[in-house]
Regions:
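Non-catalytic structural scaffold of enzyme domains
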Residues: 2-287
Length: 287
């Protein structure tokens, strides 16, 4: 078993992998988009599932966790970091950007594309409480909302439910209906999925709303932004380099990450989790 201590050993910085971090499993939706748009790149994914959801945590905790995991990834040679968590981006990316020497890409609720998509000029935003209360979110509303009214709905309970692997149970559908029906009653025709976990609810939302809401998911936009950042810093992988399978790490036992990654990443991709951590709270995959 090789050591995971340095992803970039014996290779150029450009050939090193990109780090991806989320509070849990939601960032796998971003990883899927990144692999589709940048198939030659390699990726290292960290799910902080032991501490999910971040949306109910205070700002200091979110900053501490994001910085700790970002430093862990940077120290092991990742060439860039995608903070694939709306809550972590909203509350901590400015601090983390100052501390880390590698380029960062964050995720934000798709307020601008929702404004462009909405014909009724009423749109819903489903996000964590921490995202909705953040100054970064308010800035997006001020910059892009224009004449469009945004209905803000904290998605209490959704991340925990998705982390358990539930995306369509009767209880989940009832919870979602309670969030979505007031939006429809208010005339919303567009819904911003303001958490990277929520794209896993895409089909259930469409069924509950009879496809009356245009869903805004920013995963593909994140992939385009990462491509631009790698270009700007001369960090695109050298031509002819074969992408390696993603390395996946979890702060819980990794079983849910393994199951969901195998289903989402396709091609028979398998995640193996080693139960013996080499540092506090970390469970590492076999390599």
């Amino acid at each position: 078993m090789s050591s995971p201590s340095d992803f970039a050993s014996e290779e150029s910085t450009a050939a090193a992998p990109v780090g991806i971090f989320d509070s849990g499993l939601g960032g796998l939706s971003v990883l899927r988009a990144l692999r589709a748009q940048l198939p030659e790149e390699s990726f290292v994914y960290v799910a902080d599932s032991r501490h999910a959801p971040y949306g109910e945590r205070d700002d200091a905790f979110i900053i501490e966790r994001t910085l700790a995991i970002g430093e862990w990834l940077a120290a092991r040679g990742t060439k860039a970091l995608v903070v694939a968590c709306n809550t972590a981006t909203a509350q901590s990316i400015a601090v983390v950007r100052e501390k880390l020497a590698i380029p960062l890409v964050g995720v934000e609720p798709g307020i601008k594309p929702a404004t462009l998509a909405s014909r009724s000029r009423v749109a819903g935003v489903l996000a964590t409480a921490a995202t909705l209360r953040s100054a970064r979110f308010e800035s997006l509303i001020e910059r892009y909302a224009a004449d469009c009214r945004f209905l803000r709905q904290p998605g209490h309970g959704l991340v925990e439910t998705i982390e358990r692997g539930d995306t369509s149970s009767p209880a989940l559908r009832a919870l979602l209906a309670g969030y979505l029906e007031p939006m429809l009653a208010a005339g919303a025709d567009t819904l911003v999925l303001g958490c990277t976990h929520y794209p896993f609810l895409d089909m259930t939302i469409r069924e509950l709303t009879q496809a009356r809401l245009t869903l805004i998911d920013t995963s593909e936009a994140i992939a385009r932004q990462l491509a631009r950042v790698l270009d700007e810093h001369g960090l695109h992988v050298p031509t002819g380099t074969a992408a390696r399978p993603p390395h996946l790490y979890s702060t819980d036992d990794g079983s849910r990450l393994q199951a969901l990654a195998a289903a989402l990443l396709g091609g028979g991709f398998k995640v193996e989790v080693q139960q013996k951590p080499v540092a506090p709270e970390w469970h590492l995959p076999r390599q």
